[in-house]
Amino acid sequence: MGWWLFPILGYFIGSIPFSYLIPKWLKGIDVRKVGSGNVGATNAIRTTGPAVGGICLLLDALKGFFPVFITITFSGDSKIVSLTAIATVLGHDFPIFMKFKGGKGVASTLGIIFCLSWPTGLVFTLTWLVIVMLTKYASLGSLVALYVSALLGYLLKGYDTGMLFLILAVLSTLRHSENIQRLLNGTERKVNLFKR
C-alpha cells in the first residue's frame, strides 16, 4: 500500500462535515447561517444545544482519530502518521465537500491527540472545560489547550509527537485569527456548554 494513500484517506475523512450534516438532519439547522457561521463543533453546540453539538464534537474527534489509527496500524512510520494527521485536519478546515469552507480543526485535532497520547487528550479536555466554564470563551479554551498539549506531547511522547501537536496548534491558531482579534477587542462570542 503506497504511503501517500494514508494522507489522502485522512483528507477525505477529515472533509466529512459532521458539524453541518448532524444539525441539518436532526434540527433542520444550517450552521453556516447561524451563530458564527463556522462549520465546527463549537458553533453546533452554540446553535443546537449540548446534545446535538456533543454528537458533532464526538464525530469530528473520531474523524481525526481513525485515519491516524489506521496509519499507525498499517504503516507505523512516524512521518507518514504526521502527514496523515495534518492532512486530516486540513480536510476538516478546507473540506472538498463544502467548497473548502470548513471548521477550525480543534475537535479533529483532539481526536488525533487522543490517538497518539491519551493522557494528553485528557489534559486537553480538562483544560478546555475549565477555561470555557470560567470564561465562556470556547476559542480561548481551545487555543490554550492546544499549546498545553503540544508541550505535554513533547514531554510524554518525544520530539516527533510534540512537533506534530505544535504544527496542529499553529494551524488552528491561524484559523482562529478572527476570534483572537475579537478576544482582544472584548467582542468574542460566548458559549454556554449546558444550555442553548
From Swiss-Prot:
**Chief localisation class:** membrane
Pathway connected to this protein:
Lipid metabolism; phospholipid metabolism
Molecular function, one GO term: acyl-phosphate glycerol-3-phosphate acyltransferase activity
Asked if the keyword Cell inner membrane belongs to this entry, the reply reads yes
Transmembrane segments in this chain: where?
2-22, 52-72, 80-100, 112-132, 137-156
Q: Which UniProt keywords apply?
A: Cell inner membrane, Cell membrane, Lipid biosynthesis, Lipid metabolism, Membrane, Phospholipid biosynthesis, Phospholipid metabolism, Transferase, Transmembrane, Transmembrane helix
Any keyword Oxidoreductase?
no
Enzyme Commission number, as recorded: 2.3.1.275
One of the protein's GO biological processes: phospholipid biosynthetic process
Which SMART domains has this protein been placed in?
G3P_acyltransf
One protein family per Pfam: G3P_acyltransf
Got any disulfides in this one, which pairs? none
One CC-aspect GO term: plasma membrane
Q: How does it sit in the membrane?
A: Multi-pass membrane protein
- Subcellular location field: Cell inner membrane
- General function of this protein: Catalyzes the transfer of an acyl group from acyl-phosphate (acyl-PO(4)) to glycerol-3-phosphate (G3P) to form lysophosphatidic acid (LPA). This enzyme utilizes acyl-phosphate as fatty acyl donor, but not acyl-CoA or acyl-ACP.
Q: Which family does it belong to?
A: Belongs to the PlsY family.
* Quaternary structure note: Probably interacts with PlsX.
Q: What is this protein called?
A: Glycerol-3-phosphate acyltransferase 2
